[in-house]
Regions:
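Long, acidic/polar, low-complexity amphipathic helices and coiled-coil-like
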Residues: 130-256
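Repeated scaffold domains used in trafficking and secretory/extracellular systems
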Residues: 51-59, 91-104, 138-157, 191-206, ...
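Acidic, serine/threonine- and glycine-rich low-complexity intrinsically disordered segments
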Residues: 214-342
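Beta-propeller fold detector
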Residues: 86-93, 124-145, 179-199, 233-238, ...
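C-terminal motif of bacterial Sec signal peptides marking the signal peptidase cleavage site
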Residues: 23-26
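Bacterial signal peptide processing site
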Residues: 28-31
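Post-signal peptide N-terminal segment of secreted/secretory-pathway proteins
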Residues: 72-169, 178
């Protein structure tokens, strides 16, 4: 079961004006300098979507899947197998979806809060098999307040939801999201405060530690590991323009810089660069906890308002390399069109309408599927695109 920031094979459907999408399959549940950390009630839930949230719970013969898609005005939840619309939930704002960590709930970020969406599919392990359940999808009012919602990351049995406007992140145990088979009415959280507000992230590590970005509202300069009180344990300041992170095998993590990437494992940071390209930003990455390889974008035009990259990179977290590969001339991709396949394949949905499949070990293109017509990227990052 997924409990980390690996990226699944999913795309948004630009023809419908959709903003973001996330697929969830019912599987067994369960799955940074001076600051302070205090336990709190954190989140509470009232009577929202009452009819849906109290819908019957049905046991099925096998696992079900749900596909949640945001649009300008709400969230639509579909059956992941036959694409039947199950629920159209109204919610204002520019909405983004995140994994809530328990393989049942999603987090809906609207800029000022993280609200929990019950997709209505889950399973319970029972000896050598599992029991599978479904109910109607519903948006609870169980939420976390956040000044400028940003990255939400689940790993090592915890979830950290970052607030860019305050430089704080709330941590919770995803096992506590359910009570009596329904979304819990309260959620205990612990808040960790970093020195300065910034567009950052926090990755839960073992031993109640967190891998975080370091910076302020103007610049981001590196990464650090902090404890539950926000105290720095170790730090690396050699990562200008920090953006993007991914989880790889063996509790290894990659962090994007404007001149390369940082690889973190077992208390040690390693900087990886490509000297032929002094400016080489890999600010978006797609990893999986089952693979040592991380797919990353590769941008080399420092002055471009919008660079449409025609190269991509694969980071080897064991060999400490970032290999660069070229797409056909005139073909590019965006931060939304990167993913990983069921066996760790590197996936790119490119502007020629193809889903390209690569072997991450050597960058070989294994094949492609023509999914749509050619398309181009909008200069407004919030606009929908494949």
């Amino acid at each position: 079961c997924m409990s980390n920031t690996r990226k699944s094979f999913l795309t948004s459907l630009s023809s419908l004006g959709l903003v973001s999408s996330l697929l969830l399959a019912g599987c067994a549940g369960g799955t940074s300098s001076a600051g302070s950390s205090e336990p709190s009630a954190g989140a509470s839930s009232g009577d929202s979507n009452a009819s849906a949230s109290q819908s019957p719970i049905v046991e099925g013969k096998g696992a079900s899947t749900r596909l949640a898609i945001t649009y300008d005005g709400g969230v639509m939840v579909y059956d992941g197998k036959d694409m039947k619309l199950l629920q159209d939930i109204h919610k204002d704002g520019f909405l983004r979806l995140n994994d809530a960590g328990d393989n049942r709930h999603l987090i809906v970020a609207d800029g000022s809060s993280y609200t929990f969406l019950d997709t209505g599919v889950w399973s319970v392990a029972h000896g050598d098999h599992s029991h599978y359940y479904t109910t109607a999808p519903s948006l609870s009012t169980l939420s976390l307040q956040a000044d400028h919602t940003g990255h939400v990351i689940a790993d090592n049995g915890k979830v950290a939801a970052f607030a860019d406007g305050t430089g704080t992140f709330d941590v919770y145990d995803p096992a506590n999201l359910v009570s009596n088979k329904r979304t819990a009415t309260n959620l205990e959280t612990k808040q960790v405060k970093l020195p300065n507000p910034h567009h950052g992230f926090a990755i839960p590590l073992p031993n109640d530690q967190y891998l975080v970005a370091v910076g302020d509202s103007k610049t981001r300069t590196g990464a650090a590991v902090v404890d539950a009180n926000g105290k720095t344990i170790t730090e690396n300041k050699e990562c200008p323009g920090v953006h993007g992170e991914a989880i790889a095998r063996d509790n290894t993590f990659t962090i994007g810089c404007t001149d390369g990437v940082l690889i973190y494992r077992d208390g040690t940071f390693t900087k990886v660069t490509n000297p032929q390209d002094p400016y080489s930003r890999s600010g978006n990455q797609a990893g999986t906890a089952d693979s040592p390889y991380v797919l990353a974008d590769y941008k080399t035009d420092k002055d471009a308002k919008l660079e449409r990259p025609e190269k991509f990179a694969i980071i080897d977290t064991v060999a400490h390399t970032r290999e660069v590969y070229s797409l056909p001339k005139g073909v590019s991709y965006t931060f939304r069109s990167m993913g990983r396949g069921p066996n760790g394949e590197a996936l790119l949905l490119t502007t020629d309408g193809k889903l390209r499949i690569y072997d991450p070990a050597n960058g070989t293109e294994l094949g492609s599927v023509q999914l749509m017509n050619t398309w181009s990227e909008s200069e407004t990052w919030q606009d929908p695109r494949p």
